[in-house]
A protein has these predicted regions:
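Regulatory input/activation interfaces that engage signals or partners
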Residues: 183, 188-225
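N-terminal short beta-loop-beta anion/metal-coordinating cradle
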Residues: 1-65
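A C-terminal functional module that forms or caps the active site or interfaces directly
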Residues: 146-201
Length: 225
């Protein structure tokens, strides 16, 4: 199987590429792709950049040039639920936007003509180990770093079931929906807005201590396919 993996940031990619065997680089349209193997599967990994536009462009370039059978978006996210802690892994059974509204008679979070919720790939979800640090549920995306409890409260008012917030999953999920490519978002919680007086510092501390096993579950799932 050919699998695409998308991260947003250079420091996320630096934790991911050591997991690739026979690693080589390929540049297309100014974007660099890391090609290699995980177990018996061909993997194409890339850093798309932060935000929804970068994420969509990266996902579409990956799909058009490499035709993956599955795309996984991974990296860090902010916790958005009292039951989610820093270093937990949140798997997006569903993904939506928290900052999209197309006007009266539309549903908050839905792009007109498209689903409100994008569904995660059930094959991988069913393979997840039962561990207290692995949470399954809703991830919401928007073009802002969530740093205040007021913002979390606003998101929760529209999506009470939300577990995590990020800036890319929704755009990648939408691109995969339009290009008929299975998708899953798997995020490591780096900070918890509202749980700390300074979640920006909490986020920075996470990266100072970011363990090599941050992407261990991703590697485990892919090699088990």
């Amino acid at each position: 199987m050919k699998i695409g993996i998308i991260v947003a940031m250079k420091k996320e990619l630096a934790l991911l590429t050591p997991l690739l065997d026979n690693h080589e680089l390929k540049t297309i349209d100014g974007q660099t792709f890391s090609l290699g193997m995980m177990g018996k599967h061909d993997v194409v990994a890339m850093q798309c950049g932060i935000g929804k536009v970068n994420a969509a462009i990266g996902a579409l370039t990956l799909i058009n040039h490499f035709r993956p059978e599955l795309i996984i978006n991974t990296g860090v996210a902010g916790g958005a639920n009292a039951n989610v802690n820093v270093m937990d892994l949140v798997v997006g059974v569903q993904v939506t936007y928290h900052d999209v509204w197309c006007g009266p008679e539309s549903t908050w979070g839905a792009v007109q003509g498209l689903p409100l919720y994008y569904e995660g790939d059930q094959r991988l979800i069913k393979m997840l180990p039962q561990r207290p640090d692995i949470k399954q549920g809703l991830i919401t995306s928007g073009d802002q770093f969530i740093d205040r409890i007021e913002k979390i409260n606003e998101i929760q008012s529209k999506f009470p079931q939300v577990l995590a917030v990020d800036m890319e999953s929704g755009a990648i999920a939408q691109t995969c929906e339009l290009r008929h490519t299975p998708f899953l978002s798997m995020r490591v919680i780096s900070d918890s807005p509202g749980a700390s007086h300074n979640n920006t510092q909490q986020y920075n501390n996470f990266w100072e201590e970011a363990p090599e096993h941050t992407f261990a579950l991703l590697h485990q799932l892919i090699t088990s396919l």
